[in-house]
Swiss-Prot record:
The record marks Y124, K170 as: Important for catalysis. InterPro entries: IsoCit/isopropylmalate_DH_CS, IsoPropMal-DH-like_dom, LEU3_arc. NAD(+) binds at G258, A259, A260, F261, D262, I263, A264, G265, K266, N267, I268, G269, N270. The lineage of its organism: Archaea, Thermoproteota, Thermoprotei, Sulfolobales, Sulfolobaceae. One of its GO terms (biological process) is isocitrate metabolic process. One of its GO terms (molecular function) is isocitrate dehydrogenase (NAD+) activity. Belongs to the isocitrate and isopropylmalate dehydrogenases family. This is 3-isopropylmalate dehydrogenase. Pathway: Amino-acid biosynthesis; L-leucine biosynthesis; L-leucine from 3-methyl-2-oxobutanoate: step 3/4.
Length: 337
């Protein structure tokens, strides 16, 4: 089974890390005979300046026909690109791994957590308005359908990992909305994996105190946004964290970090988060096709990255090295065989 990928370079360091990473994508296609076609589309700040839209209609036409979206970091127009794409294609699951990389020292030891965040509801639904002068109201939307749906995603991941799920909420205060989310998680998860619940403030503290206690965390949109950034930093660095936005018909893969305009054009941007997002993309392709070539490609790319970090010979300044983007890309490329 082949795939068409809409490739968005993004802004800031995005065009550098994406364009320089293309040779790795091409090599993996060749090594594993992957039938993947990449089609570049414009989106983000540069598209906004050129066309008056961060997500131009012509780009949307290409994205609509593509199977998967792969993007670099987008600048100030990120909400007009990523949030809009999530809404258009109902990409309801935000998957954020927080996994230690060999060669990056942290005081937390080996961390391997997967945060499964509901991506379409909660306060981020955007239902807010001014009631009167000096008074604003935001509506928190939680439905049983979306809550059960994200719990099922968490279950599927947990069954392939350590079979442990923590549902994170704040039902002791938000008894109705968070209570509904917790009830939905219980109905899907209890009895099928090692299941527990934790209030979000306790989860934030326990991530710092003992991150090894977590395997898969299933949570709401706002809590997941905050906890996933915290977990990524605990695992080593927010700057090397990948992510996926997954729906039934479309998926988007992107680095967690921003566009880093301050280092754009200096050839020191770190492509690791983008490349780990590519590894996640191959994993998704395997799930959709059941073609072993994709999972082999995913593991090979991840292993190549880990080998380079373990040797610490070509790391960029953000992770304690003095190498360039090109240096790191070259080392990963060579490790692929």
């Amino acid at each position: 089974m082949g795939f068409t990928v809409a490739l968005i370079q993004g802004d800031g360091i995005g065009p550098e890390i994406v364009s320089k990473s293309k040779r790795i994508l091409a090599k993996i296609n060749e090594l594993y005979s992957l039938p993947i076609e990449y089609i570049e589309v414009e989106a983000g700040d540069r598209a906004l300046a050129r066309y008056g839209e961060a997500l131009p209609k012509d780009s949307l036409k290409i994205i609509d026909k593509a199977d998967i979206i792969l993007k670099g970091p987008v600048g100030e127009s990120a909400a007009d690109v990523v949030v809009k794409l999530r809404q258009i294609y109902d990409m309801y699951a935000n998957i954020r791994p927080a996994k230690s990389i060999p060669g990056i020292d942290t005081k937390y030891g080996n961390v391997d957590i997967l945060i499964v965040r509901e991506n379409t509801e909660d306060l981020y639904k955007g239902f807010e308005h001014i009631v009167s002068d000096g008074v604003a109201v935001g509506m928190k939307i939680i439905t049983r359908f979306a809550s059960e749906r994200i719990a099922k995603v968490g279950l599927n991941f947990a069954l392939r990992r350590r079979k442990k799920v923590t549902c994170v909420h704040k039902a002791n205060v938000m008894r109705i909305t968070d209570g509904l989310f917790a009830e939905a998680c219980r109905s899907v998860l209890k009895g099928k994996v090692e299941y527990s619940e934790m209030y979000v403030d306790a989860a934030a503290a326990n991530l710092v105190r003992n991150p090894q206690m977590f395997d898969v965390i299933v949570t709401e949109n706002v809590y997941g946004d905050i906890l996933s950034d915290e977990a990524s930093q605990i695992a080593g660095s927010l700057g090397i964290a990948p992510s996926a936005n997954i729906g039934d018909k479309k998926a988007l893969f992107e680095p967690v970090h921003g566009a880093a305009f301050d280092i754009a054009g200096k050839n020191i941007g770190n492509p690791t988060a983008f490349l780990l997002s590519v590894s996640m993309m191959y994993e998704r392709m395997y799930e959709l096709s059941n073609d072993d070539r994709y999972i082999k490609a995913s593991r090979a790319l991840e292993n190549a990255i880990y080998l380079v970090y373990k040797e610490r010979k070509a790391l960029t300044p953000d992770v304690g090295g003095n190498a360039t983007t090109d240096d790191l890309i070259n080392e990963i490329y060579n490790k692929l065989g």
